[in-house]
């Protein structure tokens, strides 16, 4: 099925603009390794134009057009964006699948979530007005105090390639709901659908400069955005290494950041489980989105009493996963996003073998696919806690396995990581699950499942998985500042100093 990739420019101040230096980057279909189009490559010159446009959007008509407009005004645009994306779902889902390798059914699910996220933040935008001037109870009756919530200003949003449009929406929707003006810099490996978001914003008449979208390389477009003195906040999702660099750059300007970084999340399976149900959740938790999930539960911590039976069943589930072109009906595992990622994942598997681990299944290209960046679902056993495969994020369809004999041992293994994004526990004993969830050092815990995500619930991690929370009301708070306003209401003078009239 031939899909035409739209030829787009940068989106600045409500208009399509050629990059100042006229640079472009090829789009490579990860299923075929073919160049299927190009995206514009922004540089510091384009960042400057986008920042100027964003600041104009905030100050236009003394802020009444956007930043200080009633929340219902902003909600109207967010709902229009949600509706338009819903109308274009079949087209956008196919573009997503072709661009990043995600199976079409997953991409379609993502686009539904995109629309839902814009709708959700439209509701929160409407609710903001009622929260203004919330009174504060004070111990001194001579004073009254209230709180104002105001947009933080111009925000830079840097997003990854595994959920290109959805992860962008997680940042764009709350930022716009709060009244900020935003500059979105998606990953150069998968930017196509973010440029379609720009087209949607044009169609619905979003005020110029409220959302600007700059595609391009991290060091050419992302770095100037982070270090720009007139960008008030950076929100980033991506690798821990890049997140550390962003923190360092932002610190020079004491600029706030929120970071959602890497993970090496555990899934703990006790011996009282329904083995088929637990095996499917284990596979889904690691191989969904081709294994390219920051929260992937890629460390299976398995009770020794059921280890042999469970792994045998898990292998059968994995062999039943259809690996194919993302547009092929029934595809459940597509290619990883790029040649670079493909080589990195295979190297991680080879390193595990060289360190003494055993590849129980997978570990290579599927025999029936001669082209594309495809990797079989891979299960690795005989793992020790010092091995790289146990400690470092692979970001591919690779699951490593260790067994345990006691609950305390399982918890120790689960927390044996410098990451802390997600964790899952599977057991029929719900008291144990509750107890275990409290002991897990992670920002997200799943009980008897893995990876479900809802825009109403907070998302974010601990330790080297970053800080700050996206989604829910916490996601909106990311883009708001809190201002205290205190008024002296007594008719009496303050009386601290002696009045000159009494001298």
UniProtKB/Swiss-Prot annotation:
Which UniProt key words apply to this protein? Answer: Cytoplasm, Metal-binding, NAD, Oxidoreductase, Sodium
Name the positions where Na(+) binds. Answer: 28, 99, 189
Tissue pattern of expression reads:
Expressed in leaves, flowers and fruits.
InterPro entries hit by this protein: Ald_DH/histidinol_DH, Ald_DH_C, Ald_DH_CS_CYS, Ald_DH_CS_GLU, Ald_DH_N, Aldehyde_DH_dom
> What is the active site of this protein?
260 (proton acceptor), 294 (nucleophile)
Q: Which Pfam families match?
A: Aldedh
Tell me which family the UniProt entry assigns to this protein.
Belongs to the aldehyde dehydrogenase family.
The name this protein carries in UniProt is Aminoaldehyde dehydrogenase 1, peroxisomal
């Amino acid at each position: 099925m031939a899909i035409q990739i739209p030829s787009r420019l940068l989106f600045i101040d409500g208009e399509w603009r050629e990059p100042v230096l006229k640079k472009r980057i090829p789009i490579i279909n990860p299923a075929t390794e073919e160049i299927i189009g190009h995206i514009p490559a922004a540089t510091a010159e384009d960042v400057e134009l986008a920042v100027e446009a964003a600041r104009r959007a905030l100050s236009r008509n003394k802020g009444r057009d956007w930043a200080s407009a009633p929340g219902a005004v902003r909600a109207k645009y967010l709902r229009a964006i949600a509706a338009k994306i819903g109308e274009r779902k079949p087209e956008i889902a196919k573009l997503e699948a072709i661009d990043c390798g995600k199976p079409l059914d997953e991409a379609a699910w993502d686009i539904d979530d995109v629309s839902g996220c814009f709708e959700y933040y439209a509701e929160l935008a409407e609710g903001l007005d009622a929260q203004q001037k919330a009174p504060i109870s004070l111990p001194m009756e001579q004073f009254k105090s209230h709180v104002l919530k105001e947009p933080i200003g111009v925000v830079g949003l840097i997003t990854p390639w595994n959920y290109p449009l959805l992860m962008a929406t997680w940042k764009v929707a709350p930022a716009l709901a709060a009244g900020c003006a935003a500059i979105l810099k998606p990953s150069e490996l998968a930017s196509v659908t973010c440029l379609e978001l720009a087209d949607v914003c044009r169609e619905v008449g979003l005020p110029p400069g409220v959302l600007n979208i700059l595609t391009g390389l991290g060091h050419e477009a992302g770095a100037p955005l982070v270090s720009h003195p007139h960008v008030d906040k950076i929100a980033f999702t991506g690798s821990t290494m890049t997140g550390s660099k962003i923190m360092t750059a932002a610190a020079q300007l004491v600029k706030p950041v929120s970071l959602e970084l890497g993970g090496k999340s555990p899934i703990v399976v006790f011996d009282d489980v329904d083995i088929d149900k637990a095996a499917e959740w284990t596979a889904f938790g690691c191989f969904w989105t081709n294994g390219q999930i920051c929260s992937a539960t890629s460390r299976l911590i398995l009770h020794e009493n059921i280890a042999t039976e469970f792994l045998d069943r898990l292998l059968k589930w994995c062999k039943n996963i259809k690996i194919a072109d993302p547009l092929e009906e029934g595809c459940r595992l597509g290619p990883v996003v790029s040649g670079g990622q493909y080589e990195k994942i295979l190297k991680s598997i080879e390193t595990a073998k060289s360190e003494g681990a055993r590849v129980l299944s997978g570990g290579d290209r599927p025999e029936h696919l001669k082209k594309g960046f495809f990797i079989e679902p891979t299960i690795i056993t005989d793992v020790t806690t010092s091995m790289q495969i146990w400690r470092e994020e692979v970001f591919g369809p690779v699951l490593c396995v260790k067994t345990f004999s006691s609950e305390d041992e399982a918890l120790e293994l689960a927390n044996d990581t410098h990451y802390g994004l997600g964790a899952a526990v599977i057991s029929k004993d719900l008291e144990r699950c509750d107890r275990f969830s409290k002991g897990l050092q992670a920002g997200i815990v799943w009980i008897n499942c893995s990876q479900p995500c809802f825009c109403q619930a907070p998302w974010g991690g601990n330790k080297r998985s970053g800080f700050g929370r996206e989604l829910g009301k916490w996601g909106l708070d990311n883009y708001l500042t809190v201002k205290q306003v205190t008024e002296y209401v007594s008719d009496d003078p303050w009386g601290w100093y002696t009045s000159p009239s009494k001298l």
